[in-house]
Amino acid sequence: AFGLLMAAVAVWTFMDWVEAGCSHKEQGFLWVRNRFFTKKAWICRNVDTAILLGLFLGLTAFWNGAALIGGLLILAGLAVFSDGKLDYVICAGLAVLFSELQSKIFVSGSVMSPSFYWGFLADNKSISGVLWYLVEISGFFFVGMIVAAVFLKRGQRAVLMGCLLPMAFAFLVSLTPDINVNHKYVMISYAFVTVFWGWIVRCVFLAGKNSWKKWAGRAAAAVLC
């Protein structure tokens, strides 16, 4: 819980970086290009904050390595759409450094053995089979959020995509011989994406101006819960 809390603090803090990157007026490819090939996209915005967050995230590896990896994956997703990418690099670099130091001190032998592993626990490893497995374990939660992303604002989509990265990681990579461990990354994505789901349910609940639309919205919100 402490590791996940620190990851949440880091994600919440870097929201200002995401807002700065998504507030530019450019549209489409020009905006995407400027997120990588301009000075603002890379120059540090707050080095002290990046160092502090990197220190705290690195120390969480002692309690929960999955929370550290999940948090760094989300931050990597946010960094793509943010200004001040060097702050993300500093934060992630320090977090990995402190994590490695702890593993050298407290653990003998290799801690992780990364390998490509497609499909997580899905019996059918085809794309359709994996998507169906995702529906089976989460209902229409994750699939619904991907559809809802079409209607979100630029900054909201950026954060949502970042929050979904741990889940994508769980279906693509295995860090230990036991793939069941990857359920932690699915749960981390679930925890963060739930914030968006709660906001959508709230909007549906409050939708409608006349009586029948209000009650229809409340009924739909109850189903979505």
Roles of regions detected by a PLM:
Residues 47, 90-100, 203-225:
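Signature aromatic-anchored transmembrane alpha helix within multi-pass, membrane-resident enzymes
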Residues 81, 89-119, 140-154:
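Membrane-lumen/periplasm interface segments of specific transmembrane helices
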Residues 69-72, 179-206:
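Hydrophobic/aromatic-rich transmembrane helices and adjacent perimembrane loops
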Residues 1, 102-137, 164, 168-193:
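Membrane-helix boundary/interfacial segments in multi-pass membrane proteins
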Residues 1-37, 56, 193-196:
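Specific aromatic-rich, kink-prone transmembrane helix
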Residues 18-22, 28-47, 69-96:
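Perimembrane helix-loop-helix junctions
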Residues 49-64, 76:
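Membrane-interface alpha helices of multi-pass inner-membrane proteins
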Residues 9-20, 73-80, 136-157, 200-203:
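Hydrophobic, aromatic-rich transmembrane alpha-helices
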